[in-house]
Amino acid sequence: MDIIFVRHGVPDFSLADERCMTQLEKDYAPLDRAYLSELHQKLTNAVFDDAQAIICSPYTRALQTAEILNRRHGFELFVEHDLREWRADTAGGYISLAERDRRWHEYRELLKLRLPMSDERYEHVTALKARTMAVLERYRQYDKVIVVSHFNVFEALQGYQEQGLACGDFKIFRL
């Protein structure tokens, strides 16, 4: 199965951060309107034309990106809970942006070095990859799908990425 992996557009977390919302509440943040034109342009690429379905994270930023893409194509759209973001706090409470970033950098450094992850406060790459693969296996009947999700989901599938994947960008790979 060919996968066109699209990282969601640029989110606007300003209100969520201003109100010290929990991670769950932050996931309702919409896309930043200042970047919508750029996202629309990126999603007009002909590579999407022969896909058969869109499989999407349930987070608002991914859903809004998938909706923009789907407006052009009218593909069947599947929303999958397990394509969600990496969990910075497995307990599900509020953690500061600084602490979330610290955990993210630690997570990525361990991923880069291929070292075991032992901090139980955040989700490990093996768990993230397992839940993502379980979702994708259900869509094997398709030859080509678009997955709209998050950078850490892409990295769980493709390994550590030195250059990252900018919001709204996409990569194609075979599963």
Which sequence ranges carry the predicted segments?
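Phosphate-handling substructures
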Residues: L15-R33, R72-A130
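Generic beta-sheet signal
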Residues: I3, Q52, Q141-F151
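Short, active-site-adjacent cap segments at secondary-structure transitions
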Residues: D12, A62-L63, E85-W86, V153-E155
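Active-site catalytic microenvironments for nucleophilic, acid-base chemistry
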Residues: I68-R72, R138, Y160-Q163
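Acidic, low-complexity terminal tails and accessory targeting/binding regions
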Residues: M1-I3, R19, S37-V47, F78, ...
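Cofactor-binding loop segments of dinucleotide-utilizing enzymes, especially the Rossmann-like FAD-
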Residues: H8, D82, H150
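Active-site-proximal alpha-helix that buttresses catalytic centers in soluble enzyme cores
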Residues: D2-L77
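A short, acidic, amphipathic alpha-helical segment used as a generic capping/interface helix at domain edges
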Residues: A127-Q141
